[in-house]
């Protein structure tokens, strides 16, 4: 189904664990050229490189703290120099950044959550646009940006997670704006919006709370990262989604239905 991904140059931020790594595995199986990213190199990163290479990917690691604009720029520069360009950008870096109710939010908390989820995607996309534009012009097909959204963007998030939810809603909406600006360049923008997925994001929750959350999901359970990853491949494939842009694909077991 995704055979046109072979040789595609794909940068995935926040991709050495969890959903980002599961997504990298899909692309590796189809022979893509993959840039994986986290803040720093570690033995775990070395293990990930070995695993993805064994699956068939041409893989390189690019450390960067994407809460810093200059690091976003450096990441894109190093990736494109290594692989000779970029065909797909996946903005997966992000996270809760902590919890704070309205009356306890301060500038430091606000900036941390927004830098983690907004600045990282905004600036990495900004510096990627010239390369994605060139990719589309050279190939005669579309290039694309895929960002990881969240169910929280639609339902407001849990208590203390309002800034996180707002940051994801911002991401959902800015994609709509980018569609208007860059469709003429054959760059597509789509969102994968997971619901409650079994990742480290939920490690702090008690078993009782997790069970209660699962009971309110029509499919009766948390999703698995392997059930989310193929949606990124779908959006990355020109053959599958070359006429799809500006969309938000919910992967949530029916937790919220349009």
In which residue ranges do the predicted regions lie?
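C-terminal substrate-recognition "lid" of short-chain dehydrogenase/reductases
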Residues: 221-251, 256
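Catalytic Tyr-X3-Lys loop
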Residues: 103-123, 146, 171
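Catalytic loop of short-chain dehydrogenase/reductase
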Residues: 137-170, 175-184, 196
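Conserved glycine-rich cofactor-binding loop
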Residues: 16-18
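Short, small/polar-rich loop/turn modules that mediate ligand/substrate recognition or access, typified
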Residues: 85, 183, 188, 240-245
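Conserved glycine-rich Rossmann-like NAD(P)H-binding loop of the short-chain dehydrogenase/reductase
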Residues: 30-46
């Amino acid at each position: 189904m995704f055979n046109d991904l072979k040789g595609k140059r794909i940068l995935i931020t926040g991709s050495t664990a969890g959903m980002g790594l599961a997504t990298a595995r899909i692309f590796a199986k189809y022979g893509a050229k993959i840039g994986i990213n986290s803040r720093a190199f570690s033995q775990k990163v070395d293990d990930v490189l070995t695993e993805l290479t064994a699956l068939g990917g041409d893989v390189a690691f690019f450390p960067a703290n994407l809460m810093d604009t200059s690091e976003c720029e450096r990441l894109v520069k190093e990736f494109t120099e290594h692989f000779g360009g970029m065909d797909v950008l996946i903005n997966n870096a992000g996270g809760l950044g902590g919890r704070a109710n309205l009356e306890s939010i301060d500038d430091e908390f606000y900036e941390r959550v927004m830098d983690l989820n907004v600045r990282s995607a905004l600036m990495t996309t900004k510096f990627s646009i010239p390369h994605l534009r060139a990719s589309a012009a050279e190939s005669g097909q579309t290039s694309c940006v895929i960002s990881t959204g969240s169910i929280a963007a639609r339902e407001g998030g849990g208590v203390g997670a309002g800034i996180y939810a707002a940051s994801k809603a911002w991401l959902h909406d800015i994609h709509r704006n980018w569609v208007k600006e860059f469709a003429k360049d054959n760059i597509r923008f789509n969102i994968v919006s997971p619901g409650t997925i079994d990742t480290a994001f939920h490690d702090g929750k008690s078993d009782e709370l997790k069970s209660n959350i699962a009971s309110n999901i029509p499919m009766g359970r948390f999703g698995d990262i392997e059930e989310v990853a193929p949606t990124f491949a779908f959006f990355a494939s020109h053959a599958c989604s070359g006429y799809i842009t500006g969309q938000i694909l919910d992967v949530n077991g029916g937790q919220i239905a349009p």
